[in-house]
Amino acid sequence: MQFTEPDPLDFSNHDGYVSLFDGASLKGWDGNPKFWRVEDGAIVGEATPKNPCGNTYLVYRDMKAKDFTLKFEMKIVGSGGSGFQYRSQTGIPWLVPISPAVISNTGPVNLDWMMTGPQADFWPSQIYSGQFYSENTPMRIIAWRGQVVESFGDDSKRLMGAIGDRKGLGELVKNDDWNQYTVIARGGTFIHIMNGQLMAVLVDDDPNSSNNQPGLFGIELESITQLYVRNIWVKKLN
């Protein structure tokens, strides 16, 4: 019997995938038009000091999924933060107070544009990109970049192993440039990969956890920044 290596990673191979973004419009997406637009084949989210957003989300309404492989490219210009939501819900009351400046700019919070659930984090910061974040829940950061974590919903979390040095892995994240991001969700297992490098793994064994429910995809815009996302593809299993 001969041992063989797996086929090499080909980020541009979309066999078995469906596209969530047509490259020209926000068809299927739902968000505050003050912050979201399409430009040069990419979804652009932008918040400025004169147009602050706090947390706001562009929600993909045309698909819900539980088990899938998601691929996309993401770039941030500026100091704010972002992430890609998955298995997420809308309409849930927001836990963190919204600043008066944001309310003055946007009006009362529209919970249809606020997402609760798992997030693949992406920041220009060397700390957060690649980690597993549970948005708008008490769990928050569950698996930091470089960690393999086992959890049971919001009751417990335990470090099971290390993928690598958090700072060293962060040096693989490109600032002001495109990054390839892959998210794999199978049952209670979540895998985040950036630029071909494993960044974080979470195993959530609580079947009732908000992490383990089917839900929506979406993009977060947080703080003052410019965010670009393109080439969004999903291979949905269920």
Give the positions of each predicted feature.
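Carbohydrate-interacting regions of secretory-pathway proteins
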Residues: 1-238
